[in-house]
């Protein structure tokens, strides 16, 4: 198909992860929200989309669902990368034949930013593709997970829960995102991308539960 996905920072829709959303809502409503989370799952399943979705929810002060209205004041600044209470760390673009890792200097800069005075009650640090943390960048993040500043929530996304030092894993609440049913992926392709029904069904069957992968088949 080679269709263009909506970048997670702009994507207000999350497909097929209702159990994960419900778990986050329960944790928030309990009044004892863990300060660190790991969203794990295969590439294209919606990990970063969920992280931004939950970040918008927290920055908006919560609600009945994780879906923040499109006209809410947090939506525009988050999409523009300009919300003062949201800091994002991700790997730099990889060169040919290389696998980029999250740099220790980027982690340190993000931690410095997130510790500054906020405009709201909650600040959010997203570490996207956290499985690319190397030893130095993981150690830089560890202190914030050990002694989190008040009001800071850290959201990591990764392709597996076992790709971190145990010292980091033990300080995170873990959510494994589940494969999305083929029928849901096919219907989504038809609805949002106007893909023919037979083509959508074939792509969904090959995508192994990953909407993002279905766009490239």
Indicate where each model-derived feature is located.
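Clamp-loader machinery-focused feature within the broader ASCE/P-loop NTPase space
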Residues: 1-136
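Non-catalytic interfacial helical region
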Residues: 4-9, 15-18, 92-217
């Amino acid at each position: 198909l080679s269709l263009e996905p909506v970048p997670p920072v702009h994507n207000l829709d999350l497909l097929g992860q209702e159990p994960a959303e419900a778990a986050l809502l329960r944790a928030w409503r309990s009044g004892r929200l863990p300060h660190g989370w790991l969203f794990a799952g295969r590439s294209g399943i919606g990990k970063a989309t969920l992280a931004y979705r939950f970040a918008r929810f927290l920055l908006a002060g919560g609600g009945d669902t994780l879906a923040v209205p499109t006209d809410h004041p947090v939506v525009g600044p988050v999409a523009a990368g300009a919300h003062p209470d949201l800091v994002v760390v991700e790997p730099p673009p990889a060169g040919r034949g290389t696998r980029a890792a999250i740099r220790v200097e980027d982690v340190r800069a993000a931690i410095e930013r997130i510790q500054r005075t906020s405009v709201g009650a909650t600040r959010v640090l997203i570490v996207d593709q956290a499985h690319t943390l190397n030893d130095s960048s993981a150690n830089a993040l560890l202190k914030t997970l050990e002694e989190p500043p008040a009001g800071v929530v850290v959201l990591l996304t990764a392709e597996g829960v076992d790709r971190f030092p145990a010292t980091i894993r033990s300080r995170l609440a873990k959510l494994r995102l589940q494969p999305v049913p083929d029928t849901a992926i096919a219907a989504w392709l038809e609805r949002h991308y106007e893909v023919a029904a037979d083509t959508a069904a074939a792509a969904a069957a090959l995508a192994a539960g990953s909407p993002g992968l279905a766009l490239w088949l």
